[in-house]
Amino acid sequence: CFNDAHQISFTGFGSPQWHNHRSNNDGLSIKGWQAVKNYMGDKSPYRYNPTYGFGPNGERMSASHNEYHKPQLSLNHQWQINEKSSLSTAAYVSIGRGYGNAGQGYKKDANGTTYRNMWYGSYKGNLKTYFRNSDGTFAYDQINDMNEASDNGSMMAMSKSINEHNWYGLLSTYTTKFGDYIDFYGGIDFLYYKGTHTN
């Protein structure tokens, strides 16, 4: 606060998030959900994720994974020009960074099944047994071993779809009174946006 007429403030907020989720292709039938009860112990079988598992180093993994962080910073100026008029201005920036995982595979196994489809944990409402551990988790270590043993490159791979955006803006609002019954509001709103989306 410079004086009674001018106030300046700076704000910033943001919360990184990540989550694993089930693919649209990983839905189970009622019979399929009941079949995974033994994997969930005393928890609801409907929390089961057919592609949840652990990587070669014990890290948690899912064929469908998302991470994103979009903090916003704002510099605000409030000017009380006189008893009737004021000007409120905010300059802000928002930088978004994140990605989503997706399983890839372009070859077929001996049975003619494409490796890309093996990333889906279920088929027609039933749980798949491809790369399935005895505890119901998806066996990412087995996929890694298969890729290492291949003479023709990786049979199955995880790709990242990267989403980046930059927002820059200026918002200013002028307010004044004309007499006792008329309020006037006017302002400007400038915005620059650039987004980059890559795989």
Features from the language model and the residues they span:
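Transmembrane beta-strands of outer-membrane beta-barrel pores
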Residues: 14-18, 93-97, 190-196
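Feature captures outer-membrane beta-barrel proteins of Gram-negative bacteria and organelles
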Residues: 1-3
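Structural signature of Gram-negative outer-membrane beta-barrels, strongest in the C-terminal barrel
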Residues: 5, 165, 183, 189-191
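Outer-membrane beta-barrel transmembrane strands
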Residues: 57-102, 154-183, 196-197
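Acidic/polar loop-and-plug regions of large Gram-negative outer-membrane beta-barrel proteins
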Residues: 5-74, 101-157
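Transmembrane beta-strands of outer-membrane beta-barrel proteins
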Residues: 8-12, 87-91, 184-188
